[in-house]
Swiss-Prot record:
Record's function text: Regulates the transcription of the pyrimidine nucleotide (pyr) operon in response to exogenous pyrimidines.
Cited HAMAP family: PyrR
SUPFAM superfamilies: PRTase-like
Organism: Microcystis aeruginosa (strain NIES-843 / IAM M-2473)
Single GO molecular function: uracil phosphoribosyltransferase activity
The keyword Transferase belongs to this UniProt entry's keyword annotation: yes
Protein name as it appears in the record: Bifunctional protein PyrR
Family: Belongs to the purine/pyrimidine phosphoribosyltransferase family. PyrR subfamily.
Keyword Cytoplasm listed: no
Lineage, broadest ranks: Bacteria, Bacillati, Cyanobacteriota, Cyanophyceae, Oscillatoriophycideae
Catalysed reactions, as listed in the record: UMP + diphosphate = 5-phospho-alpha-D-ribose 1-diphosphate + uracil
Enzyme Commission code: 2.4.2.9
Any Gene Ontology biological process: regulation of DNA-templated transcription
Keywords for this protein: Glycosyltransferase, Transcription, Transcription regulation, Transferase
Amino acid sequence: MTPQLIEILSADEIRRTITRLASEVIEKSGDLNNLILIGIYTRGVPLANLIASQIESLEGVKVPVGAIDITFYRDDLDRIKTRTPAKTKMPLDVTGKTVILVDDVIYKGRTIRAAFNAIIEYGRPQKIRLLVLVDRGHRELPIHPDFTGKKLPTAAEEQVKVYLQEIDGKDGVELIK
């Protein structure tokens, strides 16, 4: 059977969602000079850059952006295909900072748990918050986003695919049934 593709967010809707998420981060974060955005490879990194760019556009504050690879922090290394780790890039020490971890989709919560472990190796943040473009539910761990672009209840066998211009040459979110 051919998979059915359903558009969830168009390019324009992603742009508006990023603007809204940036506004929420500004509103709920207080001191933007104490803020660091850290994107999870792969699509969390360009999302973090887009959020930071929007914050700068709205508030005139350049928020540092880092990128973190969680490959060696995963708890399912025995079940995933061999993957070459990406390079973690941290803008500065996270100690005492508010870190906003950015990812494209949250599902079971295991990627986020791995990212928490990775971040702690770079210092002790004052707090870690989570921003996701899509929350599809089905958590196995007690992890919930502080900032959510779109809540999308899904069946376990369905997939959510995020496309970003910087990686995929287009912007959009699709549900694959």
